[in-house]
């Protein structure tokens, strides 16, 4: 029984499950539906679509009409060609013989039309001139009849305008009169030639008259059809321009909608990276200074000492000689040229030489002799002794100061120490100890930095 139930269940067709839809597709469809529900259709789109449809209908209609007009023009042209060829074969040589007459007749007709137009222009100019002259005469007559009326500025302006119109009308009349004379002369010449040819070719003219009359008829008909084709072509161009403008407006609206969607998806612009927890204003930045730690202070002191120790010997000699030769005579008058550098107390070096001893180390030459500039032998000897003594003293001071370094950053210009042997020896020993301490301190600082980086 159980086996039969299992067999029947296995024989039953399995239910067909619908294919699993991708989650991304479902999300995209949901987003599209949400956007369609949230956003309303821009009313401008409907108006532009209506214009687009109307322009499309106009273009189709104008193209159809234009094609029909062109087809009709071609059919009339073919018909005229066929019939005229038949008449030429029927009439024969008379058509060629009478062509000069019919050409002269066409020229005379054209000259007649031009003469008629010139006559109308001349008549119009004559009427304008007559009216302007009547206006001036009436104005002058009213001014003379009224004794109480004064010749004021308004009356003068009115007369000036009337006079100007009279002058313009006279110029127009003169030009139209010249044109009328020229056209009349051409018309008379054309008519005279046509009469001469008519007398000369009377028989050929009568024989070929049906041909040229039919040709003139078809010519007028073809001219009308050509004008219709030109009008339809202009209307078609206008309809295409409206269609193009509607497409351009739709494209602009689409760009605006996409830009609005993009900006709404991005959201408002927030603060920059690292500015979330910053409550300090820009005005407080100059007042806030970082507190120096031990490593930074030691490194600054080491840099100051190393810079002062590596001053070249030539610079120290030159600075010592120039500073004491051109500076003030007393140590108290020497200005402090550079501000003092802050450093830890453990690295301060007490100076073994006081300022009062600079006078002993570098004695200043006494006042110049009264005979400076004289040419006596005594003055020459005195100047030579002074120069030789100054050179000896300068060389001795330079030799004694080669092993010393002055604190140029804290005390202004480089100052030489005393040349006495006990004090110079003590200063040299102290500088050696300081350089050893600085090197040890630098090694320790570098080791601490490496440990911090490793940690």
Swiss-Prot record:
This protein's UniProt keywords: Coiled coil, Cytoplasmic vesicle, Guanine-nucleotide releasing factor, Membrane, Mitochondrion, Phosphoprotein, SH3-binding
GO molecular function terms attached to this record: guanyl-nucleotide exchange factor activity; protein kinase inhibitor activity; SH3 domain binding
Location of region: Disordered: 1-63, 259-293, 306-345, 369-435
Stretches of the chain forming a coiled coil according to its record: 44-90, 97-145, 154-200, 211-255
Membrane among keywords: yes
Biased composition (Low complexity): 320-332, 403-421
Region listing for Sufficient for interaction with RAB11A and for guanine nucleotide exchange activity, in residue ranges: 31-265
A Gene Ontology biological process term: intracellular signal transduction
GO-annotated cellular components: cytoplasm; cytoplasmic vesicle membrane; mitochondrion; nuclear body; nucleoplasm
Chain intervals with Basic and acidic residues compositional bias: 1-12, 42-51, 380-396
Residues recorded as bearing Phosphoserine in the entry: 351, 375-376, 418, 421
Biased composition regions of type Acidic residues, renumbered to the chain: 22-41, 306-317
InterPro entries: SH3BP5
Compartment list: Cytoplasmic vesicle membrane; Mitochondrion
Top-rank taxon, per record: Eukaryota
Bilayer disposition of the protein: Peripheral membrane protein
Annotated effect of mutating residue 349 to A: Loss of phosphorylation and binding by phospho-JNK
Pfam family, one: SH3BP5
Tissue specificity comment: Highly expressed in testis and ovaries. It is also expressed in a variety of tissues including spleen, lymph node, thymus, bone marrow, fetal liver, colon, small intestine and prostate.
Assembly: Interacts with BTK. Interacts with all isoforms of MAPK8, MAPK9, MAPK10 and MAPK12. Interacts with GDP-bound and nucleotide-free forms of RAB11A.
Domain notes: The N-terminal half of the protein mediates interaction with RAB11A and functions as a guanine nucleotide exchange factor. Four long alpha-helices (interrupted by a central kink) assemble into coiled coils, giving rise to a 'V' shape.
Function statement: Functions as a guanine nucleotide exchange factor (GEF) with specificity for RAB11A and RAB25. Inhibits the auto- and transphosphorylation activity of BTK. Plays a negative regulatory role in BTK-related cytoplasmic signaling in B-cells. May be involved in BCR-induced apoptotic cell death.
Family to which the UniProt record says this protein belongs: Belongs to the SH3BP5 family.
Protein name in the entry: SH3 domain-binding protein 5
Organism per entry: Homo sapiens
Upper classification of the organism: Eukaryota, Metazoa, Chordata, Craniata, Vertebrata
């Amino acid at each position: 029984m159980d086996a039969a139930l299992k067999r029947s269940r296995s024989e039953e067709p399995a239910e067909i499950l619908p294919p699993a839809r991708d989650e991304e597709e479902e999300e995209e469809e949901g987003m599209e539906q949400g956007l369609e529900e949230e956003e309303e259709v821009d009313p401008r789109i409907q108006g532009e679509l209506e214009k687009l449809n109307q322009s499309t209908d106009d273009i189709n209609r104008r193209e159809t009409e234009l094609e029909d007009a062109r087809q009709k023009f071609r059919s009339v042209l073919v018909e005229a060609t066929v019939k005229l060829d038949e008449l030429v074969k029927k009439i024969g040589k008379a058509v060629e013989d009478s062509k000069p007459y019919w050409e002269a007749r066409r020229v005379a007709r054209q000259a007649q039309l031009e003469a008629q137009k010139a006559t109308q222009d001349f008549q119009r100019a004559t009427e304008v001139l007559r009216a302007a002259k009547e206006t001036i005469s009436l104005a002058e007559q009213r001014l003379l009849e009224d004794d109480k009326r004064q010749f004021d500025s308004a009356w003068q302006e009115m007369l000036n305008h009337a006079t100007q119109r009279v002058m313009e009308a006279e110029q127009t009349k003169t030009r139209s009169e010249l044109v009328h004379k020229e056209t009349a002369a051409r018309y008379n010449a054309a008519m005279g030639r046509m009469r001469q040819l008519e007398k000369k070719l009377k028989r050929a003219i009568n024989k070929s008259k049906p041909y040229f009359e039919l040709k003139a008829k078809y010519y007028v008909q073809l001219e009308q059809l050509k004008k219709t084709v030109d009008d339809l072509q202009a209307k078609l161009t206008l309809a295409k321009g409206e269609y193009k403008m509607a497409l351009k407006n739709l494209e602009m609206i689409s760009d605006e909608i996409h830009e609005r969607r993009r900006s709404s998806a991005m959201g408002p612009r927030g603060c920059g990276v690292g500015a979330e927890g910053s409550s300090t204003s820009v005005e407080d930045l100059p007042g806030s200074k970082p507190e120096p730690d031990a490593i930074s202070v030691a490194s600054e002191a080491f840099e100051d000492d190393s810079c002062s120790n590596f001053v070249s010997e030539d610079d120290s000699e030159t600075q010592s000689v120039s500073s004491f030769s051109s500076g003030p005579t007393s140590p108290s008058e020497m200005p402090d040229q550079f501000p003092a550098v802050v450093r830890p107390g453990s690295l301060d070096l007490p100076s073994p030489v006081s300022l009062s001893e600079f006078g002993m180390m570098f004695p200043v030459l006494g006042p110049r002799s009264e005979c400076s500039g004289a040419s006596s032998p005594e003055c020459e000897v005195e100047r030579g002794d002074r120069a030789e003594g100054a050179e000896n003293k300068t060389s001795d001071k330079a030799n004694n100061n080669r092993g010393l370094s002055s604190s140029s950053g804290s005390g202004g210009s480089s100052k030489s120490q005393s040349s006495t042997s006990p004090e110079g020896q003590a200063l040299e020993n102290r500088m050696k100890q300081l350089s050893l301490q600085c090197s040890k301190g630098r090694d320790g600082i570098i080791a601490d930095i490496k440990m911090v980086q490793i940690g």
